[in-house]
């Protein structure tokens, strides 16, 4: 029996979905919080293509705009912090950031705009896995769909914090010691304890897992210190008791 038109349409839709996810796509349009994604971790891992997918000059910079990503060529980390772009090129031994350059592009970037946050304190110190489960649980309580992406913030003390900045230089085995082994670029790794600051984070949901987060993971998190002077991609962490979790309100 030949396939029905409905079956063909479904197959075409699935093929388009897969292609868009691998390309890092515009499927984000219409999602809550003006969520947008450029590039794809999965595609980058498969192809080694780290070329620019969006110009930083074209990213939203209004108040309430948040985002995380990496520069083209994996030559640095990007943080969009409440409308302000902060770039870390891995050149500073303290991980300090600088302003974006006109020519900068992102190989990977996820962004959203939040007009209102729901916030609450963390009842106890939590390791990474427990905290991430807590985030999803709290998100569901305020009506967020755990299958879809959303941003969140965490402010407080972090008893343990390991983060890195990709540098674009050749990778070496030592570069993977603190977190993700990235075969495309070297990285400067920072291991700290008892630091204060903020996590700017995105939960991918099932829909954008492997696109805005590493394959097999659902969180893409950047750290910025309390002075907003140092920032990078988070590999491992613990969150201290009393830290404030902020989730977006629909």
Predicted regions and their residues:
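Bacterial N-terminal signal peptides that target proteins for export
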Residues: 2-15
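Bacterial N-terminal signal peptides
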Residues: 14-25
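Short, flexible, surface-exposed loop segments at domain boundaries
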Residues: 23, 232-233
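Cysteine-centric segments in proteins
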Residues: 30-58, 66-75, 92-216, 231, ...
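Cofactor- and metal-binding active-site motifs of prokaryotic enzymes
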Residues: 78
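Hydrophobic residues embedded in beta-strands of well-ordered beta-sheets
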Residues: 84-86
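Histidine-centered divalent-metal-coordination microenvironment in nucleic-acid enzymes
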Residues: 216-222
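A generic structural motif
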Residues: 224-226
